[in-house]
UniProtKB/Swiss-Prot annotation:
Native source species: Methylorubrum populi (strain ATCC BAA-705 / NCIMB 13946 / BJ001) (Methylobacterium populi)
Function: Part of the high-affinity ATP-driven potassium transport (or Kdp) system, which catalyzes the hydrolysis of ATP coupled with the electrogenic transport of potassium into the cytoplasm. This subunit binds the periplasmic potassium ions and delivers the ions to the membrane domain of KdpB through an intramembrane tunnel.
Compartments, as annotated in UniProt: Cell inner membrane
Gene name of this polypeptide: kdpA
Lineage: Bacteria, Pseudomonadati, Pseudomonadota, Alphaproteobacteria, Hyphomicrobiales
Protein name stated in the entry: Potassium-transporting ATPase potassium-binding subunit
Gene Ontology CC terms, in alphabetical order: plasma membrane
PANTHER family: POTASSIUM-TRANSPORTING ATPASE A CHAIN, POTASSIUM-TRANSPORTING ATPASE POTASSIUM-BINDING SUBUNIT
Length: 571
C-alpha cells in the first residue's frame, strides 16, 4: 500500500461527497414535480408522454397498484427484449451478421437486463448486433435504473406522509426519473467519454494489420452511450466481453475515476433525497455514514490483500503484490477500489478480473453483495434495501428496552418487521440454496474451472451476484449452459422482485399511519449511536448468515495458501 494509493481513494470519496447535496436537491425537486432548470425544455415532452399513454399525472396509486404497474411494465420489457434477442439475425443494424441468441441465453439475458443485474453469459462484441445493444439492452438500462429510483421514492413517501392511502404514481415517477435525471446526465457523460477516446459509431468492425503483419478485427460500435448509462444506472453490462478493462470501454485514468464516481453518485444522493423528503437531512447523512463505514472497511481490506499479494508466492520470496488479472495502466489500488465500488453498488462492471484476486481480496466483493447491496447499492435499490435494515435495527433496539420502536414518528409494528425480514431472507435463500444445488448436480459441478475452495467460490459468487442483482462474476465459471442460464435467471428475478414487493408493502403501511411526536424514550436516529447499531445489525443479520459458506470458500482458500497449499485446476 502507498500514500498515492490512499490519496486516490480519498479523492474518489471527496468527489462523491461533493455531489451528494446538489444532486439530492435537484432530484428532490424532480420527484416533487417542482420546476427545475430543465423544465422549460422537458416539461412539454413529459406532458406529451402522459397524453400519449393516457396517464393522469395527478392520479396516485396505492402500494398494491404501484407494485402491479411495476410488475406489468417489467413483464412487457422482458417479452420485448427476449423477442429482439431471438430475432436479431433478421433485424437491421447487424453489420457483422450475428446469429439469433439461443433460447436459454436469451432468457438469461432478458431477465438480467430487466432486473438491473446485467449478468452476461456472452461476449457483447461477438454475440449481439448493434440493434440488440441499442434497442434491446440500453432502454432496459434506463428503465430498470429509473424503476429503482422510483421505488426508493415511493418508500420514502411512506415515511414522509401521514394518513395517506397512496405512495405516488409509478408511471409519473418512472417518467420523471428517466427524463429529468438519467437522460440529461447520460448525454453529458456520453460526450465526455467520446472526448476520452471511446468509440460511438454504427460502422462495422475495423480490420487492421498488426506490427507482425497479422490481420486483426477491432470491434467498435455505439460504446460511449451504453457505458454512460451502464455506470450511472448501476447496470454494469459491458459492450465488450472485457467490460471496463477494455481500452475502448475505459480508455484513461480520468475516465476510470468518472466511471467509479457515477456508479455511486445517484445512490449516495438518494440518501439526501430521503432526508429532504422526510424533513430532516440528518437522517440521510446518518444512513450515508453507515454506508461509508462499511465501504471504507471493505476498501481497506481489499487494497491491503491485493497489495500484499498471494500468500503462496510470498512464502517463496515474491512480494510484489497481486497484479494477476489487472490492467497495468490502472494498477492495484484503482483495481481494488473499482472492485469494491462496483459490488458495494449493484453495478457489476469490472476493470479487473475478480477471479484473479487473492482469497481475501475476492471475499470482500462477495460479502458486499451478500449484505444485500445496501452499501450505497443500486440507484434507489440501495436506499430501500438500507431502510429495510433500519427497521430491523430499530426493532432489535426496541426489544432491548421493551418498547415499540419508532422511526420518523411512525410506529414500527409486526407487519413492517415481517415484510422487512421477508425482503432480507429471500436473498440468502436464493444465494445459498441455488449454490448448494449447483454443488450436488453434475450440471452445476461442470461449471467451475478450478478445484477445491476456489471452485466453490466461483459457484457461490455467481449465485450471490445474480440474486443481489449485481452481475459481476468470477470468470472461471462457465455460465452459458442450460443449468446456469435458467438457475441464474431465477435468482435474478426473485432477488429483484421479492425485495421490491415487501418494500412497497412497508411503504403503504407506513403512509397510512399517523405521525407521532418524539418522546423522551425515542431513540435518536441521526447520531453515531444509531449508525453503530445499524452497522452492527447489518453485519450480524446479513453477514453471519453467509459465514459458513464463506468459510468453505475464500476463508479456507486463504488459510491453505498461507500454509503453502494449492489446488490443481479442473473441476
Amino acid at each position: 500500500m502507498t500514500l498515492i494509493g490512499w490519496f486516490q481513494i480519498a479523492l474518489f470519496c471527496a468527489v462523491v461527497l461533493a455531489l451528494v447535496k446538489p444532486l439530492g436537491a435537484y432530484m428532490t425537486r424532480v420527484f416533487a414535480g417542482e420546476r427545475t432548470i430543465l423544465s422549460p425544455l422537458l416539461a412539454p415532452i413529459e406532458r406529451g408522454l402522459y397524453r400519449a399513454a393516457g396517464i393522469d399525472a395527478r392520479h396516485e396509486q396505492t402500494w398494491l397498484g404501484y407494485g402491479l404497474a411495476m410488475l406489468v411494465f417489467h413483464a412487457l420489457g422482458f417479452v420485448s427484449l427476449y423477442a429482439i434477442l431471438r430475432l436479431q439475425d433478421g433485424l437491421p443494424l447487424n453489420p457483422m451478421g450475428q446469429a439469433a441468441v439461443a433460447p436459454d441465453l436469451a432468457l438469461n439475458t432478458a431477465v438480467s437486463f430487466v432486473t438491473n443485474t446485467n449478468w452476461q453469459n456472452y461476449g457483447g462484441e461477438s454475440t449481439l448486433s448493434y440493434l440488440s445493444q441499442m434497442l434491446g439492452l440500453t432502454p432496459q438500462n434506463f428503465l430498470s435504473a429509473a424503476t429503482g429510483l422510483a421505488l426508493a421514492v415511493a418508500l420514502t413517501r411512506g415515511f414522509a406522509r401521514a394518513s395517506s392511502r397512496t405512495v405516488g404514481s409509478f408511471w409519473v415517477d418512472l417518467t420523471r426519473c428517466t427524463l429529468y435525471v438519467l437522460l440529461p446526465l447520460c448525454i453529458g457523460l456520453t460526450l465526455f467519454y467520446v472526448w476520452q477516446g471511446m468509440p460511438q459509431t454504427l460502422g462495422a468492425s475495423v480490420d487492421a494489420t498488426t506490427l507482425e503483419g497479422a490481420r486483426q478485427t477491432i470491434a467498435v460500435g455505439p460504446v460511449a452511450s451504453q457505458v454512460a448509462i451502464k455506470m450511472l444506472g448501476t447496470n454494469g453490462g459491458g459492450f465488450f466481453n472485457a467490460n471496463a478493462a477494455h481500452p475502448f470501454e475505459n480508455p484513461t485514468a480520468l475516465a476510470n475515476l468518472v466511471q467509479m464516481v457515477t456508479i455511486f453518485a445517484l445512490g449516495a444522493a438518494m440518501t439526501n433525497v430521503f432526508g429532504r423528503m422526510v424533513g430532516d437531512e440528518r437522517q440521510g447523512w446518518a444512513i450515508l455514514a453507515a454506508m461509508g463505514v462499511l465501504f471504507l472497511a471493505g476498501v481497506a481490506v481489499t487494497y491491503a490483500s491485493e497489495a500484499a499479494g498471494s500468500p503462496v508466492l510470498n512464502g517463496l520470496g515474491f512480494s510484489a503484490g497481486n497484479m494477476e488479472g489487472k490492467e497495468i495502466r490502472f494498477g492495484i489500488v484503482a483495481s481494488a477500489l473499482f472492485a469494491v465500488v462496483t459490488t458495494a453498488a449493484s453495478c457489476g462492471a469490472v476493470n479487473a478480473m475478480h477471479d484473479s484476486f487473492t482469497a481475501l481480496g475476492g471475499l470482500i466483493p462477495m460479502l458486499n453483495m451478500q449484505l444485500g447491496e445496501i452499501i450505497v447499492g443500486g440507484v434507489g435499490a440501495g436506499l430501500y434495501g438500507m431502510l429495510v435494515f433500519v427497521l430491523v435495527a430499530l426493532f432489535v433496539a426496541g426489544l432491548m428496552v421493551g418498547r415499540t420502536p419508532e422511526y420518523l414518528g411512525k410506529k414500527i409494528e409486526a407487519k413492517e418487521v415481517k415484510m422487512a425480514m421477508l425482503a432480507i431472507l429471500c436473498l440468502p435463500l436464493m444465494m445459498l440454496g441455488l449454490a448448494a444445488l449447483a454443488t450436488v448436480l453434475p450440471a452445476g459441478l461442470a461449471g467451475p474451472a478450478n478445484a477445491g475452495p476456489h471452485g466453490f467460490s466461483e459457484i457461490l459468487y455467481a449465485f450471490t451476484s445474480a440474486a443481489a442483482n449485481n452481475g459481476s462474476a468470477f470468470g472461471g465459471l462457465t455460465g452459458n449452459t442450460l443449468f446456469y442460464n435458467t438457475t441464474l435467471a431465477l435468482g435474478m428475478a426473485v432477488g429483484r422482485f421479492m425485495v421490491i414487493v415487501p418494500a412497497l408493502a412497508i411503504a403503504g403501511s407506513l403512509a397510512a399511519k399517523k405521525t407521532l411526536p418524539a418522546s423522551a424514550g425515542t431513540l435518536p436516529t441521526h447520531g453515531g449511536l444509531f449508525v453503530g447499531l445499524l452497522v452492527g445489525v447489518i453485519l450480524i443479520v446479513g453477514g453471519l448468515t453467509f459465514f459458513p459458506a464463506l468459510a468453505l470458500g475464500p476463508v479456507v482458500e486463504h488459510l491453505a495458501g498461507a500454509a503453502g497449499q494449492t489446488f490443481a485446476a479442473g473441476g
